[in-house]
Regions:
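Amphipathic alpha-helical protein-protein interaction surfaces
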Residues: 46-49, 111, 166
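His/Glu-based metal-binding/catalytic segments typifying zinc-dependent metallopeptidases
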Residues: 1-48, 52
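Generic recognition of flexible, low-complexity loop/linker segments
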Residues: 7-9, 51-52, 67-69, 154-156, ...
């Protein structure tokens, strides 16, 4: 696992810090299963980071995360889990520590209540999306160009996810990912 940290300073009228932490993985293969697990991982991390960074540490007004897996028509595939946080400069160290600590914790344990909430949301969003032309147009194009079927097994995969599935995914994902940290701090 490689890690790159780009911390830089910028003169600002209103001092603030921004952190973007991204874990890239091009070794784990693209699949509907991995794409769903990456999405769920990002949503769980968003919930955790909001609670720990915003509510408990008061280190940021907002914070979020997202996970995606994508494949292009030339066969290139990549996963990305990203945490982003406009953070209070004086609390950047604690915020960044929470980001790292909590993704590591997720690789060993996942709260079932969070997973249940996200599963219900994903299934509802899926049903809503299937009522739009854009959804079906994108599905046909992805199937034609790349041979992907992100529709048929979606509900089944989402419904059957367990906390252990998410933790194993995160553990496997992190073991072969590269981490990039981009941190902007105010210049005195």
């Amino acid at each position: 696992q490689k890690s790159v940290n780009n911390t830089f300073y910028r003169k600002m009228e209103t001092p603030k810090a921004n952190a973007i932490i991204s874990w890239f993985n091009h070794k784990m293969p693209y699949s509907v299963d991995n794409a769903i697990k990456a999405d769920v991982t990002g949503q769980i991390l968003s919930m955790i980071y909001l609670k720990k960074i915003r509510e408990e540490a008061s280190a940021a007004y907002t914070v979020g995360a997202q996970g995606v897996f994508s494949k292009s028509d030339d066969g290139f595939q990549i996963g990305q889990i990203v945490a982003y946080c406009p953070i209070k400069p004086e609390k950047k160290d604690i915020g960044l520590k929470i980001i790292d600590d909590e993704i590591a914790k997720l690789s060993t344990t996942c709260e079932s209540e969070m997973l249940d909430k996200i599963q219900k949301l994903l299934l509802k969003q899926f049903d809503d999306r299937t009522k739009t032309n854009g959804y079906w147009s994108s599905l046909v194009m992805n199937n034609y160009v790349m041979g992907l079927d992100n529709h048929t097994a979606y509900k089944d995969v989402v419904s059957k996810l367990t906390p252990m599935d998410i933790s194993k995914f995160v553990k496997d994902y992190l073991s072969s990912s590269n981490k990039v940290s981009i941190i902007m701090l105010p210049k005195e």
